[in-house]
UniProtKB/Swiss-Prot annotation:
NCBIfam families: dut (TIGR00576), PRK00601.1 (NF001862). This is Deoxyuridine 5'-triphosphate nucleotidohydrolase. The lineage of its organism: Bacteria, Pseudomonadati, Pseudomonadota, Gammaproteobacteria, Enterobacterales. The keyword Hydrolase applies. Gene3D superfamilies: 2.70.40.10. Its EC number is 3.6.1.23. HAMAP family: dUTPase_bact (MF_00116).
Length: 154
């Protein structure tokens, strides 16, 4: 297991808000909370940046963090991430910000302390490129989008 350093940037995190945490024993992602003074309106079809009040430092170049939407917010309310996935590099040390996008037709309200996203840590493979003139031929070759059809017999 790797240790990830965390820094509290906003004093409200010490008093009222909890640090990222797993909701259940089987959770893969740690919930990230909105560090706000007051409720913020996210208008329909608009985006907003929500501060978390924390910074992390991964330090290990073989680990990255991904900020992902919470499934319930996306499915039930239409609230997803404005950048779809937030990629946190191992050398980033700034505040974690959540870009929320309201893809619904209804305004949505983000309250202080709301769980608005989740963060997971994943291993990274950092390959070296080998320059070649040609690849070894495969049965797929250059076939791309839709090449296997819709029903795709296995």
């Amino acid at each position: 297991m790797s240790n990830i350093e965390i820094k509290i940037l906003d004093s409200r995190m010490k008093n009222n808000f909890s640090l990222p945490s797993y909701a259940t024993l089987g959770s893969s992602g740690l919930d990230l909370r909105a560090c706000l003074d007051e409720t913020v309106k996210l208008k329909a079809h608009k985006t907003i940046l929500i501060p978390t009040g924390i910074a992390i430092y991964i330090a290990n170049p073989n680990i990255t963090a991904l900020i992902l939407p919470r499934s319930g917010l996306g499915h039930k309310k239409g609230i997803v991430l404005g950048n779809l996935v937030g990629l946190i590099d191992s050398d980033y040390q700034g505040q974690l910000m959540i870009s929320l996008w309201n893809r619904s037709d209804q305004d949505f309200y983000v309250n202080p302390h709301d769980r608005v996203a989740q963060i997971i840590f994943v291993p990274i493979i950092r390959p070296c490129f080998l320059l070649v003139k040609n690849f070894n031929e495969t049965s797929r070759s250059k076939k791309g989008f839709g090449h296997s059809g819709v029903s795709g017999v296995i």
